[in-house]
Each structure stands twice: as structure tokens, then as C-alpha cells.
A protein has these predicted regions:
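Alpha-helical transmembrane segments and their immediate juxtamembrane flanks
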Residues: 200-226
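Small-aliphatic-rich amphipathic alpha-helix that forms the alpha element of a beta-alpha
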Residues: 34, 38-39, 109, 115-177
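A glycine-rich helix N-cap at a beta->alpha junction
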Residues: 73-84, 180-207
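Short glycine/serine/proline-enriched coil/turn segments at secondary-structure junctions
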Residues: 43-46, 157, 196
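Short secondary-structure junction motifs
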Residues: 47-50, 163, 185
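N-terminal amphipathic, basic helical "cap/leader" segment at the start of enzyme domains
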Residues: 1-118, 222-246
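Generic beta-strand structural signal
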Residues: 105-107, 161, 184-188
Length: 246
């Protein structure tokens, strides 16, 4: 039974929620467990690689959500209408973007950049102003690992507790940083199921979307796309996991 429970939670955490029941509040006990999970995840030599900002205030969550108009609508057919490459990076056409309702949730966790308790030689050197580009890159990668491990652990425990979860890494950094006061790296939303198709945007209707990307009638909620993951696993460098279960 415990294996099926874990697998069910994994399946929930893999598929993000696009709408939540905002009339409910997360209990203090559950919130404490979620925070404990996020801040006690494994990291290299137990260094501190991020600062965690937690928001339960609906007004602040709304402001965070307003920073996320970065979800791009495009197909290969309309690709050139959507993106433009510049020296400062790729710029997307705002007319083909929507806010990410994965994090218009009951509680929001924002992972922000932080460096503390550094113990490894490379990490200490990377934290100095004259560090090489390679050393800085390696340290940033380690910090990204820590955020990834923590957020994955957080999402899984949220699912075990019966909640739905969502992620957002595309947002306006300056706008969000004005709220968090630290450089934001990743947003995780956790909340209650809204008893509707998880892919439906909580606020955007098809009439708000360019015609070529509408998913139904004008008065229906616009539906996010969904994709399946294909991952090959080998056991001991040879046996195919799917056909040779241990």
C-alpha cells in the first residue's frame, strides 16, 4: 500500500495545477510541515544556497502572480510572430503571453539567491569578486541543484498531504524582487484542488487569447497544453528497466 501511495503522490506532483480553490486556507500544521520539508532538503555539505520566502497573504500572492506574464503561446507555424532574438536575449511578443496561474495558489514559496555556511574550497572562491567564470558557473550550478532538490521534495510532500502543486521559473525578476527583496530564482505554488480540469487557466478565457490559440468557446476558460515525459532507464548499464523489472 505504501508504494502505491508514494507513486500516486509522484503522479500528482508531476502534473501541475493551473487553478486552485482560493476560498480555503492551508492549516498551520501542514504549512509547518511544508516549510520544514523545503529547508531541510539535502545540499552540498549542508551549505545554505537559497533563502525561502513564504506567502499566504492573498494580496501578496496576487502581486507575485502579476509578475508572471511570461507563459508563451506559440507553435512552429507562428514562431516568428512570437520571438525575436536580440543581444540582450530572446524577447517574446507580450500579445502571445499569459500569466502563470500555477502559482495563484493558497501558499507560495519563492526561492531566492543566498550564500551562507560555505565550506567547500570552490564555493568560497566563487563567492569572491575576482572568481573565474568557470568557478562561478560551477557554484551557480550547485546552488541550482539545491533549489531543485528542495522544490522537488516540497512538491512531493505537498502531494502526499493532499494538495496540488505548480512551478514557475519565468517571471519579471525586477518586479518580483521588489516584493521578495532578494533575487528570486523559482516559485512554487501549493493549494487545494478546484474540482475542475487542472489545465484550465483560473482567470483567462478563450476570448482573451489570439484566435489561433483558443481551446474552446469564447466564454470557456483557456486550457494550457500538457505534455508527456519520455525517459529511458537502464539497470547496470545494460538491462532495460521496462522489460527487466528487478
Amino acid at each position: 500500500m505504501k508504494h502505491q501511495t508514494i507513486k500516486k503522490a509522484v503522479d500528482v506532483a508531476q502534473r501541475t495545477q493551473r487553478n486552485y480553490d482560493l476560498s480555503k486556507k492551508i492549516s498551520k500544521e501542514d504549512l509547518d510541515t511544508l516549510i520544514y520539508t523545503a529547508i531541510n532538503s539535502p545540499s552540498k555539505q549542508n551549505e545554505t544556497h537559497f533563502k525561502l520566502k513564504v506567502y499566504t497573504d492573498p494580496n501578496l500572492i496576487r502581486k507575485i502572480y502579476d509578475c508572471t506574464k511570461r507563459f508563451s503561446l506559440f507553435t512552429r507555424e507562428y514562431f516568428n510572430k512570437m520571438f525575436k532574438d536580440t543581444d540582450k536575449g530572446v524577447i517574446a511578443n507580450a500579445n502571445y503571453e499569459v500569466k502563470n496561474s500555477q502559482i495563484l495558489s493558497n501558499v507560495v514559496f519563492v526561492y531566492c539567491d543566498d550564500e551562507d555556511n560555505l565550506r567547500g574550497g570552490e564555493q568560497i572562491i566563487a563567492n569572491k569578486g575576482n572568481a573565474s567564470e568557470y568557478t562561478t558557473m560551477k557554484f551557480n550550478r550547485i546552488k541550482d541543484f539545491s533549489i531543485g532538490i528542495s522544490s522537488g521534495q516540497l512538491s512531493l510532500v505537498g502531494a502526499i498531504l493532499g494538495y496540488k502543486t505548480g512551478y514557475c521559473s519565468a517571471f519579471s525578476v525586477p518586479e518580483l524582487q521588489s516584493i521578495t527583496k532578494n533575487e528570486p530564482k523559482l516559485i512554487v505554488g501549493i493549494g487545494y484542488d478546484n474540482n475542475m480540469d487542472r489545465r484550465l487557466h483560473s482567470e483567462i478565457f478563450n476570448r482573451d487569447i489570439p484566435k489561433e490559440y483558443r481551446t474552446g468557446a469564447d466564454d470557456e476558460h483557456w486550457k494550457f497544453p500538457s505534455f508527456d515525459k519520455e525517459l529511458k532507464v537502464e539497470i547496470n548499464n545494460g538491462l532495460d528497466y521496462e522489460n527487466n523489472m528487478l
